[in-house]
From Swiss-Prot:
<dbReference type="InterPro" id="IPR029028">
    <property type="entry name" value="Alpha/beta_knot_MTases"/>
</dbReference>
<feature type="binding site">
    <location>
        <begin position="123"/>
        <end position="128"/>
    </location>
    <ligand>
        <name>S-adenosyl-L-methionine</name>
    </ligand>
</feature>
<keyword id="KW-0698">rRNA processing</keyword>
<dbReference type="GO" id="GO:0005737">
    <property type="term" value="C:cytoplasm"/>
</dbReference>
<dbReference type="Pfam" id="PF02590">
    <property type="entry name" value="SPOUT_MTase"/>
</dbReference>
<comment type="similarity">
    <text>Belongs to the RNA methyltransferase RlmH family.</text>
</comment>
<dbReference type="InterPro" id="IPR029026">
    <property type="entry name" value="tRNA_m1G_MTases_N"/>
</dbReference>
<protein>
    <recommendedName>
        <fullName>Ribosomal RNA large subunit methyltransferase H</fullName>
        <ecNumber>2.1.1.177</ecNumber>
    </recommendedName>
</protein>
<keyword id="KW-0808">Transferase</keyword>
<dbReference type="GO" id="GO:0070038">
    <property type="term" value="F:rRNA (pseudouridine-N3-)-methyltransferase activity"/>
</dbReference>
<comment type="subunit">
    <text>Homodimer.</text>
</comment>
<keyword id="KW-0489">Methyltransferase</keyword>
<keyword id="KW-0949">S-adenosyl-L-methionine</keyword>
<feature type="binding site">
    <location>
        <position position="104"/>
    </location>
    <ligand>
        <name>S-adenosyl-L-methionine</name>
    </ligand>
</feature>
<feature type="binding site">
    <location>
        <position position="72"/>
    </location>
    <ligand>
        <name>S-adenosyl-L-methionine</name>
    </ligand>
</feature>
<dbReference type="InterPro" id="IPR003742">
    <property type="entry name" value="RlmH-like"/>
</dbReference>
<comment type="function">
    <text>Specifically methylates the pseudouridine at position 1915 (m3Psi1915) in 23S rRNA.</text>
</comment>
Length: 155
């Protein structure tokens, strides 16, 4: 299975990098995981910034037409680990099992971007820093594969 995570910016604190790398290494035995980091536009009027970042995402997503896309958005439906297990299990049954998660820019997506996708979920009802969101997501993906493979999470 291939999983890609598109996000804005880089992990810039050692503790985030360490946590992320730990889960990344653990996941290698289950999945081909790739992180795609985009440069976020941060200067200008809010709606213009949202449009520019959303357009950048749309252009990047054109390269992944055969992936199931899941947009992470704090205002969308809350997803549970069990929901994520079902999504990944369902995709594992396809020959071309490919999922792409999108962690949006810090100011959010444009309305038109959000309206063009049906798979939108929130990892929490609290606002997470984007770097922490990336770690929570990769940890949940790791947890899902432990569940799918009937393996203990804590050793």
């Amino acid at each position: 299975m291939k999983i890609k995570i598109i996000c804005f910016g880089k992990l810039d604190k050692a503790f985030y990098v360490d946590a992320f790398n730990d889960y990344f290494k653990r996941l290698k035995k289950y999945v081909d995981l790739e992180i795609i980091e985009l440069k976020e536009e941060i200067n200008g009027e809010l709606n213009k910034i949202k449009d520019e970042n959303s357009n950048l995402l749309l252009k990047k997503l054109e390269n992944y037409k055969d992936f199931e896309k899941i947009i992470l958005d704090v205002n969308s439906k809350l997803i549970s680990t069990e929901n994520l297990v079902e999504i990944i299990k369902t995709n594992l049954n396809y020959k071309t099992a490919k999922i792409l998660f999108v962690i949006g820019p810090s100011d959010g997506y444009s309305k038109s971007f959000l309206n063009s996708f049906t798979n939108k979920f929130s990892l929490a009802k609290i606002t997470l820093p984007h770097q922490l969101c990336r770690i929570v997501l990769i940890e949940q993906i790791y947890r899902v594969f432990k569940i799918i493979n009937n393996e203990k999470y804590h050793k």
